[in-house]
């Protein structure tokens, strides 16, 4: 056995020279690109500023962290959570019928193509653009963030739903066709019972994404904790930045733990 391995290894083409040449070329390109790096207008007290930032972040403002008013971290985190949660739910509800009319194994291909083009168009536009558009329509606030999260969720959730539907065993659908079942009956009695776990897992995953996106959308005034975060950074109140970041970390860890528990239960059936 060892002789066969050695013989096969000896007969293998020697590519080390090409690999060495490729590594040399990449190293030369990196060195050449490094010559273009310029530090423009460095501040004389840059290290002191960096120290103040780190010190403020690691010494968060207890007043902001534990205040229960509308300016406190708990309220802002709750608002961010609600924007992400409701946006995910609304997006999933809209995605469900949209995915059914876009699955080529359920509807005629021209109809499925129209649905896929619509989903692709929704997914093309970034969340920031949607946020700015809805802020112009509804004004700054959580409702603009909710609409943005809902629309952004439709693109991804619909795509994942369609993939799950089209991965179904074709023999099951063919047997239902032979039995004279309508499309609605296929969805009601076969697709939904089989794919509930997959759909739920997709919704949970999208909620995790929306929770982070809702924070970023706050930077453009679409509600949530993002706006106070950018205001504190602009005013150099680093202890408030630390309090907000600490609250976000705790919220994300809690959501991750709950999501993991739900996924385990779904996997076990």
Predicted ranges, named:
Residues 84, 88-96, 100, 104, ...:
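Hydrophobic positions within alpha-helical transmembrane segments of bacterial inner-membrane proteins
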Residues 98-131, 160:
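Cytoplasmic-entry segments and transmembrane alpha-helices of multi-pass inner-membrane transporters
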Residues 140-191, 197-206, 257:
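Membrane-cytosol interface at the C-terminal ends of specific transmembrane alpha-helices
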Residues 201, 242-269:
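C-terminal transmembrane helix and the adjacent membrane-cytosol boundary/short C-terminal tail
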């Amino acid at each position: 056995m060892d002789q066969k391995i050695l013989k096969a290894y000896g007969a293998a083409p020697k590519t080390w020279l090409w690999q060495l040449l490729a590594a040399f070329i990449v190293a030369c390109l990196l060195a050449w690109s490094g010559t273009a790096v310029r530090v423009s207008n460095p501040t004389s007290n840059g290290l002191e500023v960096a120290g103040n930032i780190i010190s403020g972040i690691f010494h968060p403002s207890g007043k902001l962290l534990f205040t229960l008013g509308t300016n406190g971290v708990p309220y802002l985190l709750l608002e961010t959570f609600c924007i992400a949660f409701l946006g995910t739910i609304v997006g999933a509800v809209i995605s469900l019928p949209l995915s059914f009319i876009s699955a080529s194994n359920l509807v005629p291909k021209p109809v499925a193509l129209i649905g896929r083009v619509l989903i692709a168009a929704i997914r093309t536009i970034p969340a920031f653009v949607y946020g700015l558009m809805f802020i112009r329509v509804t004004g700054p606030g959580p409702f603009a963030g909710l609409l943005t999260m809902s629309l952004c969720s439709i693109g991804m959730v619909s795509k994942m739903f369609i993939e799950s539907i089209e991965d179904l065993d074709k023999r099951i659908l063919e047997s239902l066709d032979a039995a004279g079942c309508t499309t609605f009956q296929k969805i009601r009695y076969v697709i939904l019972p089989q794919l509930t776990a997959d759909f739920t897992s997709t919704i949970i995953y999208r909620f995790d994404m929306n929770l982070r996106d809702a924070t970023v959308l706050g930077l453009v005034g679409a509600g949530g904790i993002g706006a106070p975060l950018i205001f504190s950074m602009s005013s150099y109140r680093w202890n408030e930045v630390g309090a907000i970041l600490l609250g976000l970390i705790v919220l994300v860890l809690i959501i991750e733990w709950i999501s993991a528990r739900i996924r385990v239960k779904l996997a076990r059936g």
